[in-house]
Amino acid sequence: MTTTGALGGRWRATITEWGGIEPWRDEPALQWHVAADDRWHSPENEAAVRQTRPGGAPVTETRVRIPNGDAVQRVYSVPDHGGLTVIEVENESPLPIAVAFTHGRLLSARPGSAAIEGIVLPEGSVVFPVGHHSTLTVALSHDGRGAGVLPTNLPTATGVARGWTAMSDRASRLVLPDESIADRVVAERCELALAGPVHPDDDAVSFLLGVAQLVRMGEQPEPWLPDAAAAAEHAARAGANDWALPLALQAADSVFVAAGDRRASRDLAAVRRRVANVATVLPESAPTDPARYLTWVEARLAVPVDGGAALLPAGLPPSWTGANFEVYGLPTGGANSVSFAVRWHGERPAVLWEQTGEPLLLSAPEVAPAWKSADSKGEALWPAPAGVAPVVDGFAADAGDGGSFS
């Protein structure tokens, strides 16, 4: 499931695995059906349906197999004209098709037809012809205006995806051997931006982690300050056994620093002293909660420690041995961050780093125990990983949907 909507607007919907659009407020869902040369194809009931989110952005591409090709649906939202969800259906086959939608409250270049044969659909459904190797574009208005003429010069799916990726990269950018990890990072950040963090009463730790991600992506910190302060107190009281508690309090401090609220930072310092004995022990498995997942990934690359930050604190994933990678803007406390790249020289990794903000003492206890540096930028040659031969291709071929640090 994918959340869609335009930032700055309140309209939201869920895109199902088969490309249906289910608004969160009291509006009818929009399903789609394809009439090909052989029969009607209903994506919800078809076995040969494949959906992807290129790069992790909330731009879905759903493919339905039809004779001699695919019907390819793309769904994405834009803020233009009061907010629109754009639906494209591309006919990749050499024969014409028709596409039916289960209600007619759509913007289109030409009106759809209500004459639908061969399939039973809800009253008010409409159908549009799509020529061979051509694309139909319609849109759903977020203001509920109903049917009308489709505006011209709307942003493209590719352009919208680029915008979401750029927003995610403001928080941190990861260029990893396992691309699925970076894609999921983008996806989870987009989900946070559209759906917001969990309620602090439900999970104060996740709330703080999520708010910090949003602020790092460009949201203003001030509206979050009262809830963040209360959530930090609640998390400290209730989360003593939570692996992410120290990172959540660190995240809260970054929000206060971004807002220039020194008093909140001082108050938080007292809270952090009360739980100073709580250690950050990263779980082996990736969390499912978006904010916790993002924190887990970043903390496996760089994590704040007393007086500094540790790079690759869980060690170098064996499947990354021999593969170059680089990461940018990982938080190390307050307004500080670190970027670093690993380049291989034979069996030995070389690290190049640059710190933003006040330089901290960097270390890599699991990868290079003897290495430490408080320089703002530099490079060093780390020892060869013990007992691990370089991987020629750089990473495992199949790491699954969530990526792999193994």
Q: Language model features by range: what are they?
A:
Residues 260-289, 307:
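Catalytic cores of carbohydrate-active enzymes
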Residues 86, 102-104, 229-232, 249, ...:
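Short, well-ordered alpha-helical packing segments
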Residues 165-271:
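Substrate-binding groove/exosite segments of carbohydrate-active enzymes
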Residues 1-184, 282-406:
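Terminal accessory carbohydrate-recognition/targeting modules of carbohydrate-active enzymes
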